[in-house]
Structure formats: structure tokens, C-alpha cells
Amino acid sequence: MDASIARAHSTRRRSIVGAIASQLYQSLNGTAPFRSSVQSVEPRLRFWDEVTDFPAIQVGAGQETREYEGGGFRFRFLRITVRCYVHDNDDVILALEELLEDVETVLEDNDPLTYTDSTGKSQSTAKTTILSVDTDEGVLEPLGVGEVIVEIQY
């Protein structure tokens, strides 16, 4: 996007999702302190039948709201879904819990999150809040799916 036509108050959904996906992919390579090594991290959600490599992570943007402050300042709140897929013939619940713990650690360690907006300018988020962590509790064994719902304030 041409910087001369950039808006002062624009959404940064795509940039934030991309930065989260990049951090997860770079961090979750099996080296300490992380226990998971992911095969793929994508900056979009896919249908279940499209997942072929495990463990896999997909990051997608959801609802975005605004909070208006004085002097024309506004905060944006972006809800992010981090969906995790595992395949384990021994203990799928443990494999999924380890991956979800690693995802949570990456999100917390990168708060505030630095990202590049559509004009190429470096930006930072104000706050990352993990709202919920949910799993299928082994119903799909040997496959497992879990979600971390995050709110990004920027």
C-alpha cells in the first residue's frame, strides 16, 4: 500500500495474524524450552480435511472492536483463533496439551507483539490476553484438535 494514502486508523488484522503465525513457526521447532515441533503454521483457518501434516497450527482473525478515548485516540481489540491439530497413537491428549502450552508460552513471551503494517512501518501491540483454551478431550483419537482464543489490543 502506498504510504501517502494510508489511513491513520486502519485495521491491521492481516499483519497481526501474520506476525503471530511467524512467531509460532520460528519458535516451535522442538528446541528447549518448547516440547513441540510443528510441521506447518498458516495465517488462515482451513477445513479439517485440508490438514495433512501434524502437528499443524492455523491462525485466523475474528471479530474486531474499537474503544474510543479522548483526543481522537482509539484502541482496537482483535480476537484471534489459534487452532492446533495433532496426531498421536500413544497419548493424543498429552500431545495436544504440550502443543497448547507451547502456543500459550510463545504468545506470552511475545507480548507486546511487533509487526509490520501495510505501509511497511513497524508497529507494536499494546496487550495480548489469552481468553480461553479448549480441546476435543480425545474424542477424535488418534487425532486431536484444540483452540486458543486470544484478544490483541493495539
Where are these predicted regions, by residue range?
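Charged, amphipathic alpha-helical segments and their flanking helix caps
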Residues: 1-49, 54-154
